[in-house]
Design a protein with these regions (language model features):
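Class I SAM-dependent methyltransferase SAM/SAH-binding core
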Residues: 1-31
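A short acidic, Gly/Pro-enriched loop at the edge of an enzyme's catalytic core
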Residues: 29-42
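A short SAM/SAH-binding and catalytic strip from SAM-dependent methyltransferases
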Residues: 41-53
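A short glycine-rich, Lys/Arg-flanked "PGG" loop and its adjoining helix->strand segment in the class I
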Residues: 55-70
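Conserved class I S-adenosyl-L-methionine
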Residues: 70-94
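Acceptor-substrate binding/catalytic loop of class I
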Residues: 75, 92-112
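Short alpha-helix
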Residues: 104-127
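Core SAM-dependent methyltransferase catalytic element
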Residues: 137-157
Length: 157
């Protein structure tokens, strides 16, 4: 992560749970210079819809992964239902997120992610929806990818 504050929170969580995890305050492009094609798993969660060039970030994540490695992305689909739930619902009605957190135009359809991933040497293996239950504050995997979704891709050898 690029945020020192979030790195500190993650380190605190790891220490409290007696986990041995190395956290780095870095962006993907800087990390490529030091550790290109060195990771078995690369996760990029809830970030693609916030960057100016998602295809560039997908390419960077692929560059960090070893051949045969897994790369995971989560994002928000771009359609009216996603707008209603992720922006109107989460930001304005339920106030789960600050207003303006999301820009509908930056939401990414799974087909767009898959297309950019193919160009980056990644093959889409599985796509799952993620559903948030506001009353129980729990998440569940679902077949419905109309709002939040998780993509599992594998780097070609």
């Amino acid at each position: 992560d690029k945020s020192d504050v979030l790195i500190e929170l993650a380190q605190k969580h790891a220490k409290e749970n007696q986990l041995t995890i190395e956290y780095l305050a870095s962006d993907a492009e800087s990390l490529i210079k030091r550790q290109s094609q060195s990771f078995d798993i690369v996760c990029c969660m809830e970030l693609l819809e916030h960057v100016p060039d998602p295809s560039s970030l997908i390419q960077a994540c692929s560059a960090l992964a070893k051949p045969g490695a897994w790369v995971f992305f989560s994002s928000i689909n771009r359609n009216p239902r996603a707008y209603l739930l992720a922006i109107i619902g989460a930001e304005y009605l339920l106030k789960l997120l600050p207003r303006g957190t999301h820009d509908y135009k930056k939401f990414i359809r799974p087909s767009e992610l898959a297309s950019s991933a193919r160009l980056a040497g990644l093959t889409l293996k599985q796509l799952q929806g993620i559903h948030y239950h506001p009353l129980t504050q729990n998440y569940a995997l679902t077949e419905d990818i109309s709002v939040n979704y998780l993509a599992a891709l594998q780097k070609r050898s």
